[in-house]
Amino acid sequence: MNACERLSRVLERIQKACERAGRGENCAKLLGASKTVPPEVIREFYNCGLKVYGENRVQEFLKKYEALKDLDLEWHFIGRLQTNKVKYLMGKVVLIHSLDRKNLADEIQKRAFKNNIVQDVLIEVNVGGEETKGGVEPENLKELFEYTLELPNVKVLGLMTIPPYLENPEDVRPYFRKLRELRDELQREYNVALPHLSMGMSHDFEVAIEEGATIVRIGTLLFGERKY
């Protein structure tokens, strides 16, 4: 299968999941999780119509950003983010998916203010309670969210999670549901709009869409197994 065929197959599956969930057309945005994917492959997928990509490593992202500057791409940052790397993302990524602590929020505020922009972010929540993963614990989410409300150059648009990897996607459903419930609770309690839920990857994105995902992060199904 070539790039365009792989892309259209994934888009078709997204569409069907949206319909099953009764959520209407284009209910979830497809983000190409392009860690380790070379610029020429991204260019190929761009020519097939995929314009949204997410990177995990700042250094790798900056190289691709420069190499693909001639394309009208929408870049997201989806990996764990060190405070000393925040400055390199300003003005280059439309959405940071991995805000999970106050000092990172402070740094994004500082750098966004310097650049005279408002940086859109998602708060990453560790719904599975896994020690190896980033993300704020669900019980500390409100505290972090309240903290961001005081930062004029940081705008939270929703939540993100990387749930435990389980063979059967159905077993992941409770984690996706939990994230949606946490988002709904914040919206009610603080009377704010948090339109985005970034959840679901190659093996479980359909279940994520059924549970309310608005952004799915797909790597393997588009680009093949990762070459580390």
From Swiss-Prot:
One Gene Ontology term of the molecular function aspect: pyridoxal phosphate binding
SUPFAM superfamilies: PLP-binding barrel
PROSITE patterns named among the record's database cross-references: UPF0001
Keyword tags: Pyridoxal phosphate
N6-(pyridoxal phosphate)lysine: modified positions: 35
Pfam families for the chain: Ala_racemase_N
Superkingdom: Bacteria
GO cellular component, one term: cytoplasm
Keyword Repeat: no
UniProt xrefs under NCBIfam families: YggS family pyridoxal phosphate-dependent enzyme
Family: Belongs to the pyridoxal phosphate-binding protein YggS/PROSC family.
Physiological role: Pyridoxal 5'-phosphate (PLP)-binding protein, which is involved in PLP homeostasis.
The protein's name in its UniProt record: Pyridoxal phosphate homeostasis protein
